[in-house]
Structure formats: structure tokens, C-alpha cells
Amino acid sequence: MISFVTLLAILGLLSISWADQTVRSVAGDQRVTDPVIVGDNSILDYYGGSNYDFSNNFEIGRGTLYIGKESYFSSFQSAPTDVPNSFHLLIKNTNNLQNNGQFIIENIKRHANQCSNSSIQVFPINFQNDGEFEIISGGVEGRCCLPTSVIAPQNFLNNGKFYYKVLTDTGSIYSGSCMQNVDIGASTTTTVNNNLWEFTGSINAQINGAVSGAAQINLDGSNMFVNANTFSGQVVNLINGGSFLQTSDPLSNIVVINGLGTSDTGVTSIAVKGKGKSFTYNPSSGIVKLTTVEGKTYAYQIGCGYNTKKFITNNDSGASYESADNFFVLTYSEPYSPQTCQLENSSIFSSNFISTSTSSSSSSSSASSLPSSMSSSLPSSLSSSLSSSLSSSMSSSMSSLFIIPPPYTTTRSSGSSIIDTEIVSFYSTTDSPGHTITGTTTTTLYGPHTHSSVSTPSSSSESSTTSNSSIESSSLPHTSVSSTPESSITPSSNTISSSPTSDFSSVQSSSIMESSSVVASSSVINSSSIVDSSSSSASSLPSSMSSSLSSSMSSSLPSSMSSSLSSSLSSSLSSSMSSSMSSLFIIPPPYTTTRSSGSSIIDTEIVSFYSTTDSPGHTITGTTTTTLYGPHTHSSVSTPSSSSESSTTSNSSIESSSLPHTSVSSTPESSITPSSNTISSSPTSDFSSVQSSSIMESSSVVASSSVINSSSIVDSSSSSASSLPSSMPSSLPSSMSSSLSSSMSSSLSSSLSSSLSSSMSSSMSSLFIIPPPYTTTRSSGSSIIDTEIVSFYSTTDSPGHTITGTTTTTLYGPHTHSSVSTPSSSSESSTTSNSSIESSSLPHTSVSSTPESSITPSSNTISSSPTSDFSSVQSSSIMESSSVVASSSATQSSSVINSSSIVDSSSSSASSLPSSMPSSLPSSLSSSLSSSLSSSMSSSMSSLFIIPPPYTTTRSSGSSIIDTEIVSFYSTTDSPGHTITGTTTTTLYESSIYSSSSSTIQESELSNTSRTTMTSNSSVSISSTSSRSSFSNTKSSTIVISQSASLPDSKTDIILSTSSNIGYSSRSLLSDLGTSISDSDIHHSVLHSTESYSSNESGTNPFTSIASLSNFIPESSSHTSTALGSENSVISSDILTTMSHPVATNSGDKPTTPKRSEQVSTTMTSSGPTPDTSSFDTDGMSAYSRPEFTTNSLEVNKSSTSQLGNNKQTFSNLQLESTRPHSENEVDNNTRLLQSIQQSSTYGTNNVNPLSPTGSISIPLTEDGQGDNNNWNSPATNDLCTQISFNLTATTITVTDRITITDSIHDISSEVITSYIYQTIVDQKTVTQTVDGKSLANKMSSIPKPSSRSLIQPQPPVAIELQEGAASTSRVSLVSLFISIILVLL
């Protein structure tokens, strides 16, 4: 009996579970307007139809919804009305599609082996898939089936699995050449994928709109085209010939792509839109970069361990992917086995897909002919040969002067982590025509480096230029710098550099700052070029000149004289040229490599360079390596031991001692920005001994050192032309021979030597290269003691040699992170003369910063350039402001003044030969020869005009970059015709919203150079007046705000809320000119108003406005305040703001883009009589007396427009400097009061995602037509109430106007901030329903409540009636009831 009872109980439980499961089948075409509900363990089967149209919500529990040609249960069950090979599914006008179970769509009959004319369109507002969503399409071998599928909800949240498959009639995967298209998302939609997408078979999947989340995407024989600017958190797996193609611009993040390789099942590939230029691969990090000829670089993480020789790149017209676009394709020729990435030193493989090089030849200018006067007096062959010889010799000599530009660095970061740092350095090489050109070496240092620790990233090198020269470049060093939380670091000089080629064509390369918070790496230089001046040190001129001189002068001179003259000219020219050129040998600057472990420095290696001579006598570069051993922890300062080694042995007496490395303590939560300005010394023409000393500083003070860079010194005594050969020809009388020899030897040789030396020295002196300035900052704890800036200029010592003078500018502190002060500055100048060159140690500047502050190093330098006539140039570089930033993180950009005084030595550069030339030679020969040499030298030298590299100043706020100012240089000509340097300033604003460009030309022959910036798109005027007066003591503040908004007559409901906050904080600048103010005198005035508008049923309801006034002084409604000051201080502010917001039009039209226009007029005035001389101020300010003071008036007129459509914005930074008299007993009668006025208008938009809790779906109205904000989720119950419901998109617009006035001398500031926040809800779909309360309950779903997951809530169940001919529902309820009765009886 017990076993029987147990059996019956089990049967009862089973019957209960069967009773919970419902199976419904619906056959034929369907147009469903009611919600589709599938409960748990239930099956709803739509089959046998060709057209399905759904226009209401879907709610699928843990059951199955099937829509297809054949039944879910049987392949042989279909409807007689089914249209063969046709299937159309439309899900539209649906708010929510929620799938927690299984949703299958099948557009073909199984085993039919037929193509289907199919279209699947899924357009719900919100699609949330937490289960499995699967589309099965059919493919036929040998035929092209081209169904279309679009899955484009406004908001797509995939927490489950999404499948799209193409199958044959046998159920296998179709992998034919005909690709089926499916679109996921649209440009205006939002997609979040948190689990799995899988495309199987011949599919072209087009991904549109922003995609985010954390998921896997499997491409099994499919192609995926990504046309999105946001594609984050997705890992793409290439399987069986799958391909990833990007048709959008490069992404900010690196996409992870697995499976690139070739196998038996297909070749996988990665492709980007455009034509290929080059690609690089780093085996240690697994990052590959594809660069197109359009200048776009795409980065992908493909994994480590690839063999670089197996990569294949090609350009595809798009035919392989059935696309009209061109693609740069990367494949791998063998299977790939995944390997673990390890950060270690390894070379980066680099390949130029298309080699493009442009070079221009200036042979026509460098080989200029001799003057016509010489041609007329000399034989034509002599004139041409002399011109050719001079040009050839000059060109050969000048080629060794090829100047290699300094390297530059580009750092990419994400948040507080550094992705990679790319260092591009340059070297000299030769192209196929034999021109000397610049090659580049790119070194990439991979991260990430978090801001909480110091890591030593791997360094690797790639070369982007291939040449036949035997120049090898190794990896460049990387100096890691520790930075700490709550700080931002802005690198100083990631800029653009330019350098001339041998034919003096300008080469420019650019570097763009990509990140807003980066750790600057020190600038390092990889010198791999060896200058061989052997061609210019030949003992004689080219043979063509000697033979031409001998043959062509024989007609006018005896043969012996011809040969002697040829020999003398050759020897003199060569000796003078060699002597002059050798002194221009350019020594590269040193570089530093620091190795660290955690927070400790292991050692620092400094490599410096000097000039020496190899065994053949060629002038080469030697290196001196100095190692400073550690460790140096960041909590203390230690003086490391040092050792020095020299890698080149020479005969010259060059002594070098170790260079110093001073480390500065950095506290936690601080940031350090290195300054890497280094100076190197140059040898003299005879390579006299060079001495360098080192200074070791053991305290937390960075020692500054004066560095002298001496240029070439030309000594013509040793380079005088040798006398004519003693064996004068016997054909002439001995007396004539000896006389002519003696005369020509002493006169011609000395004249040629003197003239050449004078011309060469005059020309070469203008090539004197002035080193860039450098900065040394001393700090104590979190305070900066002082900052010393050493800049350089050109001067002359007592023997007349051109040397380098230094100018030292000291900016005194301290500057703490709680305030910004304007330090006083003092300047001293030091000049070192004589030919012996002394060089002190090279500085390594570290800067310590305090918590919540950022420091930007001031390394903006300008070097001078020679004029066209190569006269002496003097320039000085003075840094005018310190780059210390307060907690507001608004960086002050430093200004650099480069003033140059140009001395015109045209009379001396073209000096004629001495008058004591032999009378036997034509008189025109001496003048012509002198003129020819000067002309040729001038023509050759002019192209060596050196353009300084540009520099960049970046202002940041927190982790955001406000703007970046790039100052670049170009060559121009002043009014006297001198070649000078002009500057171009380009300002890049955040998000490239607005940019302005200005040009500045440095005028010559002026003691001071003014800098003028013309900014467009801004209408701002400032007027300042000063007069002595005394007023009655009053203080008022007037604020007027006028706002208006208009709405069209429609049934669209709009919420417009505005909040304005205007007040003064701290002390008023203009009211403190002569009045003491304490904290008790400071009040705050706040005006707050809110407005809301709504429309009634007919759309003509007038607006209602609610305004509140709080904390406004005084209590009267006149909006007048007497808060600041007790007497005789007046400050007024009138702000008039008008706004118009056309946000919606009549029903059926798209809403208009919100616009904003404003006008601001501000007037502030302050005046007062003689103040009290007693002590005042609780903040420690000492008392002072002002017998008289001026009235300062400031008027600011601003007119700006902001339009969201094309992101227009105006931004103004204004400074006003006024002078007021003081008492007679004060030392400085004209103390300057610096006033800084800043105005800015910013706005932002935020399209609220309806899936987030902040979204609003509908607006229920009460009986009187007003919105019930306290009960959003309660539908109206009154029959007469109007209910308006649409598909809404919420847009938030924030506008902030800020006017700040500060007095940095007296620590006074006044600030007016007006903030407008608009939240507008507009009707995107214009779906409007107006019903009474009775029918509302049946036709309108309840308003969903926000949840952490979505706004989609279960709908009340709606019964689905079975159509005629449909399968019956399983009936188990009677059985269950019968068993239950038996159990009860037992």
C-alpha cells in the first residue's frame, strides 16, 4: 500500500508540472497587435506563414518562442496558405522586447534546398536578451541567396547569446562565395554586448553605432565590418577564414583579435579602410599597427609569438568582401599557436608597404656661375671650370654639415595608464640618387605604466627607412618617472621637428599629443650618423680645375705660371675650406638612460659625445659613458657613486669626468615631470682639449650649472696658401721666374688665403648654433624654493671669436599648491671668452610636486638663425613666467621672447682681394675671384638657415586637456631683406571644438620683440580708465536674468527646467583697493529660479512659471546687495542673458536641434577715498596706506552663440594690467596690479539611455493638464483625464558662464558663475495616443519603474486566441484534478 501511495504522489507532482507548461501553436500569416507573452516552460509556435507583423511588446520567460516556415515540432507541419520561398518578419512600434528564454527565427523550410526571398526587421525601442536569440537562414550551394536582416533597436542590451547562422538543406554550415548581409544597430543606436555574438557561415555583418560591454564575438567564416567610433570591451575570435574589417576611423582603444593565421579551413585576416602604407608588429606585446596612406593608424592586439617573416600585406579593392571600399589587408601565412606575452626587449618589426620619398635638388643654385665680369676678362673655360670646382668643393664640404634633427616623443595613455610611448629619432643616410637624406628610427616603449608605481617598460626599435649605408641604430633608452594619484602630468615638448637635407629641402614630421594625463619620458637621442669630412680635406681641388687652369690660362700666361697658379689656387682653396669646415663638426647632445626597480633607481647611464679623429684622419664622434649607481628611493636623496668609461680612443687630449645625477624626493600623491634640456660642447677647429667637470649635490636641491657652448674658431695662420713650387719653369728668365714666383707667392697666396679666410669666417660665424635653454628647480618638501632658467646668446670675446654667453633668470618662490603667486625675477648674465672651452656638468633637472597639483615644465625654447648674408646673430631666450599650477589645474602657458639684433656685414663678406695683386694678372681677376667666392659661399650657406623646432604648451584641468598651443617656426625676410625666423601659433581646443591660428614675425633691428596674437571667432572688448577721485562708500550688486522659451502648438509635452546660481566669493578685487575687509563682511547672494512648461490637450495652454528667491541681500525685491565692504566701495554686475530653444515642431516632424544664443554685458567699478592706516585683515596682510588711488573701471562685452548641431563654442582669455599711484614714501611709484579676467561658456549634451534609471518614458497629466511629478507611475483614472504617451528621448544641456577676477598680489578674487541646466524631453517617434480613462486600462501598459537592470518590466498576461485550424492546447488539468481527488480519498 505504501508503494502504491508513493507512486500516486509522484504522479500527482508530475501532473502539477505538466499543468504549468503550455504549448500553443499558431499557423499562417499573422498581424499581432497585442503583447506576446511566453511563460516559463512554455512554447509558442508560429509556423506556416510568409508574413509576420508584430506591433506590441514581447515578454519571453524561460520558455520558447518560434517563428518560421515550418513548425517548431515537425518539419512536415505547415499551413496550406504558405507562400513558398517567401518570408517577411517585422517587429516595429514595439517598446520592449524582453527575452529570458529562447527566441528562434527561421526563414526557410528545412531540407528544401531553396533560396528564400527573406527579410527580417527587428526595430523595438528596447531589446534586452538574457537568453538565446537565434536567426537561421538558408544557403544553397552554387546559388546566391541574398536575404536581408536588420536588428536595430534603439537600445540593445545583450546579456545572453546572440546567434546568426547560414545552413544548407542538410544542416551543415554554408561557406559559399555569396555573403548574406545582416545589420546590427544604427548610427544613432546604443549597443551593449556583455556575453556572446556568433556569426556562422557566409555572412557580412555590419556593426553600426556605439558598442560597449565585455563579451566575445565569434566570426566563424564570416566577415564583420565595424563602422563605429566606439567599440570597447569586445574580444573578436577569427575562425575558419573569418575577417575583421574596420571602416570607421581609428578607435581610442586597442581591439583584441585572436586567430589571425592560415589553416586548412581558411585564411583569417584583419583589414582597415584605405590604401596601405606600412605596418609594425611588436612580438613582446602582440600589438600590430596598420598605417594607411591617408595618415590613419589602427592598432590591434593579436597576440605574441608571430614570425614577422610570415606576415603578408596587400591592398584589396573590396571585391573579396563584396564591398565598394578599398582595404589594407593583413594576413599570416601559417597557423598560429597562442603564446603568453612577456614584456622584454625585442625588436619591433616594421615594414613600409609603399615606399614614398621626395627629394629636391638644388644643384642649379649651388653651382652658380661666376659673375659676368670675370667671364669677360678670363677665358670661358677658366671661368666655368673655376665655378664648377668651387661648387663641387663647396657641395662636398657642405654635405658633412648635414644636420640631424632632435628626436621627439609621443605618448598614448588610457586613464591613468600609459599604453605605449613612441620615440622617433633621426639619422643620416643616402637615397638611390646619392642624396644625403634623413632616416628615422622609431622606438616603442610598451606599458601599461600605472601612476602608482614605477615600471621599467621594454624598449624596442623599428626602422622606417631602408638605406644602403652601413648605419645601425639600436634601441633608444627610456627614462621612467614615478607619478602618484590625484595629479596630472603634462609633457613639455612632444612637438614637430624639421631638418634640411643635403640639397637643403625642408623635411618635417609631426607628433600629436593623444592623451590628457601622461607621464613624460625624457627626450633621448640616438646618434647613429658618422660625419666623414674626408671629401673636404683633400689636398688639392678636383683634377678638372687643375687641368682647366693649366690649359685655359696658357694662352695668356706662360705654362709654368698656369701650373703654379693652378697648384696655388687648389692648395689655398682646399686648405682654407678644410680648415673652416672642420670646425663646424656638430656634436650630438648627450642622452640619459635610467633603470629602475619599483620605486628605486638601479643606475643611470649618461652618454655624451665629443669630436676625435680616426686612423685615416677623418673627424668622427666619440662617446663617453658615465654610470651613476643607486639605488635611489623616492623617499630620500642619495649621492650615487659614478664611474666613467670611454668608448673611443683618440690622440686628442680630451678629458671627461662623470656627469651628475641629482634625484629629488617626491612625496606620495604627487606628480613629477622631468625636464630634459641638455647642452653639449663643440670642439674648436684644431680640436684643442676639452675639459668637463662634475658637481655632485647631496641635498634635495638640483644644482644648476653654467654651460658654455663654443663654436668654431678659424685660425688662418696655418691655412695660408703654400708658396709656388721652387722649380719655376726654365722657359722664363730666372729673374722673372724668381720675381714672379716671389710676387705671386706672397701676394696671390696671402690674398687668396686672407680673402677666403675672411669670407669663410664671416659666413661660418653666422652658423654659430645656440643651444636651447634649460631649467633648474629647487624644492623643499612640497614648496618650490626657486626656479633658475639659463638661456644662451651669441657674443664675441676679446680676440674676436664668436662664443656663447649665458643669461640666468631666477624665479623666486615658494609656490605651494594652495595658491598661485607671481614671483619676482632677477637676471644675471655671464660670458666666457678665450679659445679654451670649459664645460661643466650637464644638468638633470627633477621637479617635485605636491598633492593634488600638476606641474608643467617650461622647456619652450627658441634658437636663432643666420641671416641671408651670414652676419653675426645675437639672440636671448627669456622665460617670463613660471609653470606652477594651483589646485585649479589651469596651466599658465609660458611665453618666450626671442629678440635678435642683426649686424649686416655685407661689405666684409664680399671683401675684395688686397690691392697688392700682381700687375701681371688682369685687374678684374682679383675682384672677380673675390666676388665669385663670396657669391658661391653665400648661395651655399643661405640654404643652411636653421629653423628651430617647434614647441608645445598644454593646459590641463585634472585629467582633461583644456587646450594645446603649438608654436612652430618658418623662414621669412624682414624689410632690409635679412632672413629671419617667423613663428606660427596654433591653438588646439578640447575635442577640436574650436581652433584659432595666429602668426608672429620677429622683427629685426629692434631691442624688444612684441608678440601679437589675432584670434578669430571671438568678439571681446576691454577698456580700462584711471582717474583720481573719492566717492561715497556704497556697494551694490545688480543681477538681471531674462529668459524666454517658446513651443509650437502640438501635443508634444516638454519639460524645461532652469537653475541659475550667481554669487560672489572671497574678497572683491576692485573693492579692496583701499578698504579693509574681514570675513564677517563677506556675504553670498544666490538667485535660484526654476521654470516648467507643459501643454494641454489642444497644445495652447499658456506656460506656467515657478520662481523662488533665497538668501538674497537685502530682503527687498530690487535684487540689490550691499554685502561687500562697509563704505565707499562700489561693484556692480549686469548680466543679460537671452535664450531661445526651438525643441519640437508639429506632430510628425523631427525635433529641431536645440540652440543657444546669449549676450553678456558686465560692468564693474570700484572707487574710494583715503583708507584707514590701521592694521587690518585676519589673514596676515600688513597694513598699508594709500593717500590716493585710482578708480578702476572694467567693461566686458561678450556675444556668443552655441549650437549643438556642429559644436560651436567661443572661449576667451583676457588679461588687463593697470597702474595706480602709491604714497610718496614707497620705493616703487608704479607698482603694477595684475588683473586676470577669464570668461568661458561651456555646454554639454547627454542623451539619456532609456535603459538607465534616469530615463522618462511617459508623462501622465492630471485633470487640469499639469504634470504630476510625484506619481509618474500611476496612470490617470479619471475618465476626463488626458493621457499623453510617446517614445521619448531625454536630452540634458548644461551651460556654464564664468567670470573670474583675481588680484594675485593681494590674494583677492571675485567670481560670478551662472549655470543653466536644461532637460528637454522631445518626441522622437511622434507616436501620440489620447484616450479616456476607461479604454486606457485595456490599451496602455503601465509605466515601468526604473530598475538597476532595465526599464522593462513584465506585462500583465494577455490571452492569445487560437485561430481556426491550429493545433489544440495540451489538456492535463482534468487528469490532475482526478489524481488529486484520489489522493484526498486515500
Swiss-Prot record:
Signal peptide region: 1-19
InterPro entries: AWP2-like_YTTT_rpt
Localization in the cell: Secreted, Cell wall
Any single GO CC term annotated in Swiss-Prot or TrEMBL for this entry: extracellular region
GO MF terms, alphabetically ordered: cell adhesion mediator activity
Highest taxon of source: Eukaryota
Pfam families per UniProt: Hpf1_C (PF20646)
Compositionally biased residues, Polar residues: 1140-1150, 1159-1177, 1198-1218, 1241-1259
Intrachain disulfide bonds: C115-C145, C144-C178, C304-C341
Protein's GO biological process: cell adhesion
Chain residue ranges for the region called Disordered: 429-507, 530-553, 612-690, 714-739, 795-873, 1000-1032, 1140-1186, 1198-1227, 1241-1269
Glycosylation sites: 117, 315, 345, 468, 526, 651, 709, 834, 898, 1008, 1017, 1096, 1197, 1229, 1287
Keywords from the named record: Cell adhesion, Cell wall, Disulfide bond, Glycoprotein, Secreted, Signal
Its job: May play a role in cell adhesion.
Designated name of the protein: Adhesin AWP3b
Annotated source species: Candida glabrata (strain ATCC 2001 / BCRC 20586 / JCM 3761 / NBRC 0622 / NRRL Y-65 / CBS 138) (Yeast)
Gene coding for it: AWP3b
